[in-house]
Regions:
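Glycine-rich segments within core transmembrane alpha-helices of 12-TM secondary carriers
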Residues: 150-162
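Central cavity-lining transmembrane alpha-helices of secondary-active solute carriers
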Residues: 48-69
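Small-residue-rich packing faces within the transmembrane alpha-helices of Major Facilitator Superfamily
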Residues: 59, 79, 86-87
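Intracellular juxtamembrane helix-capping segments at the cytosolic ends
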Residues: 132-146
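Extracytoplasmic
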Residues: 13-41, 134-138
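Cytosolic juxtamembrane N-terminal segment immediately preceding the first transmembrane helix
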Residues: 1-25, 103-110
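C-terminal ends and interior cores of transmembrane alpha-helices
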Residues: 26, 83-112
């Protein structure tokens, strides 16, 4: 009886962790909108480029994330994704302190400075993180729920935080 209780407690902790990861996915994905407003003041065309870069990463990371789960497992893939996300956020932070006075190329609306390129690179890397986390969370919640209706219910509960 004691083993069953420990197993259920571990399952509850895993479910709560997966729901927390759903909330992190939402945070990182939606972080581009307020930053985009700031970039929109300097470059009228760049307001949604951060979100675009975030979702463009799915194109490049979807299949490798699935392969990573097959080779490394759910836990290691989630931890790698969190490390990648931290690197992406640090790169985005660097865009606020470096490159504002270094023009990279010119458009008809003016010079595009290095800090925008750094920010977009950070958003792209954060998109890798979000893609890997999505690849982990959805099947993991279904697995924790035992598949079928119960697994889908857990995905819906986690999705409310997304």
């Amino acid at each position: 009886m004691e083993q069953k209780s420990v197993n259920n407690n571990g399952r509850v902790i895993a479910i709560i962790t997966m729901c927390f990861i759903f909330a992190m996915i939402s945070f990182v994905t939606n972080m581009g909108a307020p930053f985009g407003n700031i970039w929109g003041f300097k470059y009228s065309w760049a307001a949604m480029m951060g979100n675009f870069m975030n979702f463009a990463a799915y194109l490049f990371m979807g299949i490798p994330a699935g392969k990573m789960i097959e080779s490394k497992g759910y836990k290691k893939t989630a931890l790698i994704a969190l490390a990648v996300g931290t690197i992406g956020l640090m790169i985005q932070y660097l865009s606020s302190i470096f490159g504002d006075d270094i023009p990279v190329f010119n458009l008809s609306s003016g010079a595009v400075c290095l800090n925008l390129i750094i920010y977009l690179l950070g958003a792209f890397i954060c998109g890798f993180c979000v893609c890997m986390l999505n690849t982990v969370v959805n099947p993991m919640l279904n697995l924790l729920g035992g598949g079928g209706n119960r697994g889908n219910q857990l995905i819906q509960i986690g999705g409310t935080l997304n």
